[in-house]
């Protein structure tokens, strides 16, 4: 999933030969899930048609302050304030000069001057124009203002000369902006280990001890963590949840509590920053596993159980600088039991949900949680979708790490 999904991007196209490349850039933004609004300078029409750009962006293309046929006013202030990012590509020497000197003689420039968001500009011009001291001064002015330069490439230029001034390729511009967006996410470069789903403890080749966990909560936390820039490892018990469009999440599938224990321990000391144990791990397993199917010969059946390793307890005991989060699903004395678990297992935070709450717990797409931490703070939340719950959990973690 792209960090740009859902972002609104204004693409300003100016009158340079590289304008034809911007069609590919628009297409890439749209494929990343962006809403793209294009503004062309009048000169840009000489190099690419509004019809092409409108088709690719799925939005009308603006050039003038108002439509001469309908009288519709294209409000440059509203346009500027509606966007997350503005991308000027290609940015000609003429346009850079006007941007640096606060000229507003067309809709594109007026929109730029009204912007309070991040502006990227990708210069495109001949070598001597790019190296010209006045042009360099204009670029420096824009950078001092806070605009971000996407450096041009070296290569064959429109004049036939070789050198610096060739607009960065569409894929390079996209990657540049994605990397910028990722670096500004709250969990950028943080390594987060998440567990999800149930564990199955085999009795014989066809039967097992398990629970009703669907894995939805853990998977939503993994997805939300990835959106916030984290490097995510998800250790999942058997469940039907998918990670479509989240290819950067490393998923490790396990079956039993012993397999989950081993996987968690293997990753725990691998520079992990945050551990979120959302899995419903079986507390007990059969003392012996039958190699053949057990027949129902007797009226009663006794199955000796032995205790599984307590993964959270072990993590808490060996914790260094990791932020450790546990989950507690309770049926009675909820806060008391959750607080006891928090303290006994040396957790930083615990997420409590109760089976007494309608719409919360296993299999539902919603959940109602209470968050307790090791400093005595308690946060209560209403019933929400598990996607929103995941966002609130991560927001709470971020705030507690900051303090």
Please provide the spans of the model-predicted regions.
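A cross-family phosphate/adenosyl-ligand binding-site feature
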Residues: 1-120, 126-329, 333-403
């Amino acid at each position: 999933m792209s960090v740009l999904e859902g972002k609104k991007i204004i693409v300003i196209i100016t009158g340079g030969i590289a304008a034809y490349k911007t069609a590919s850039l628009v297409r890439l933004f749209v494929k990343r899930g962006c809403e793209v609004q294009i503004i062309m300078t009048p000169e840009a029409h000489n190099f690419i048609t509004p019809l092409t750009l409108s088709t690719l962006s799925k939005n009308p293309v603006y050039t003038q302050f108002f439509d001469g046929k309908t009288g519709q006013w294209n409000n440059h202030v509203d346009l500027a304030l509606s966007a997350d990012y503005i991308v000027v590509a290609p940015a000609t020497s003429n346009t850079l000069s006007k941007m640096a000197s606060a000229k507003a003689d067309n809709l594109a420039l007026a929109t730029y001057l009204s912007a309070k968001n991040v502006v990227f500009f990708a210069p495109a011009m001949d070598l001597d124009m790019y190296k010209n001291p006045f042009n360099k001064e204009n670029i420096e002015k824009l950078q001092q203002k806070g605009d971000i330069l996407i450096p041009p490439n070296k290569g064959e230029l429109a004049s036939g000369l070789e050198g610096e001034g060739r607009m960065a390729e569409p894929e390079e511009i996209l990657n540049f902006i994605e990397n910028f967006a990722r670096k500004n996410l709250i969990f950028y470069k943080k390594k987060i280990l998440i567990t999800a789903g149930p564990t199955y403890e085999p009795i014989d080749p066809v039967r097992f001890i398990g629970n009703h966990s669907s894995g939805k909560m853990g998977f939503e936390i993994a997805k939300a963590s990835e959106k916030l820039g984290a490097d995510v490892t998800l250790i999942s018990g058997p469940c039907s949840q998918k990670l479509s469009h989240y290819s950067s999440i490393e998923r490790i599938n396990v079956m039993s509590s012993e397999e989950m224990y081993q996987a968690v321990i293997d990753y725990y000391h691998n520079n992990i920053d945050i551990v979120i144990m959302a899995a419903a791990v079986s507390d007990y397993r059969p003392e012996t596993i039958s190699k053949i199917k057990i027949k129902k010969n007797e009226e009663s059946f006794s199955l000796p159980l032995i205790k599984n390793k307590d993964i959270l307890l072990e993590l808490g005991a060996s914790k260094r600088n990791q932020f450790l989060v546990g989950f507690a699903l309770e049926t009675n004395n909820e806060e008391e039991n959750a607080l006891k678990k928090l303290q006994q297992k040396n957790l930083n935070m615990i997420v409590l949900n109760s089976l007494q709450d309608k719409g919360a717990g296993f299999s539902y797409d919603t959940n109602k949680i209470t968050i307790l931490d090791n400093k005595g703070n308690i946060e209560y939340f209403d019933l929400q979708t598990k996607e929103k719950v995941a966002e609130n959990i991560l927001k709470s973690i971020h705030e507690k790490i900051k303090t």
